[in-house]
């Protein structure tokens, strides 16, 4: 849901097809929401066109009202994802200093066309394994731990 303040853990998602969307796989939160998402596994996701990103983590989603309840994202593995076109950044993970993302694995990800490949901030223990955007292998991301 859009506003989720509880715990989500031990989830497995597979074999999904997405025609056209803003974000293919989208995790969003802010400092008002709290809770956690952990031990999530996703695989075999096919997307055609994603306007804002095929994979997008955002812990600074608008609507913040001054709370101090960061959502914890940890132990997330996303693999075997293909996307034909992204109109913004293909892979984004934007944590905050007080709401970092932990243990994120992206494996066997292929985005055929995107103006920017990757943008990562405040991610601890990011693994990029066989990730390709615009025909180029992505092995690291500039990030702030």
Language model: regions and residue ranges:
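Eukaryotic acidic, Ser/Thr-rich intrinsically disordered low-complexity regions
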Residues: 123-145
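Mature catalytic domains of secreted/periplasmic carbohydrate-active enzymes
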Residues: 27-29, 57-62
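Short, T/G/N/S-enriched strand-turn elements that build extracellular solenoid repeat scaffolds
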Residues: 6, 15, 66-71, 93-95, ...
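Right-handed parallel beta-helix
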Residues: 7-20, 38-49, 74-84, 102-110, ...
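Generic long, charged, amphipathic alpha-helical segments
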Residues: 54-55, 67-83, 88-91
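Repeat-solenoid scaffold signature
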Residues: 20-22, 29-36
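Structural detector of coil-to-beta-strand junctions
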Residues: 24-26, 54, 89-90, 117, ...
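Short, small-residue-biased leader/transition segments that mark boundaries at the very start
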Residues: 1-4
């Amino acid at each position: 849901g859009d506003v989720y303040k509880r715990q989500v853990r031990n989830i497995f998602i597979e074999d999904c097809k997405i025609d056209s969307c803003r974000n293919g796989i989208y995790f969003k939160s802010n400092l008002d929401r709290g809770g956690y998402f952990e031990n999530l596994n996703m695989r075999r996701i096919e997307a055609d066109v994603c306007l804002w990103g095929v994979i997008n983590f955002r812990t600074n989603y608008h609507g913040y009202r001054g709370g101090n309840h960061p959502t914890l994202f940890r132990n997330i593995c996303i693999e075997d994802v293909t996307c034909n076109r992204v109109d913004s950044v293909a892979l984004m993970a934007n944590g905050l200093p007080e709401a970092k993302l932990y243990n994120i694995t992206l494996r066997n990800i292929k985005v055929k066309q995107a103006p920017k490949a990757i943008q990562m901030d405040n991610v601890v223990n990011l693994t990029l394994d066989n990730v390709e955007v615009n025909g180029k292998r992505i092995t690291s991301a500039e990030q702030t731990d």
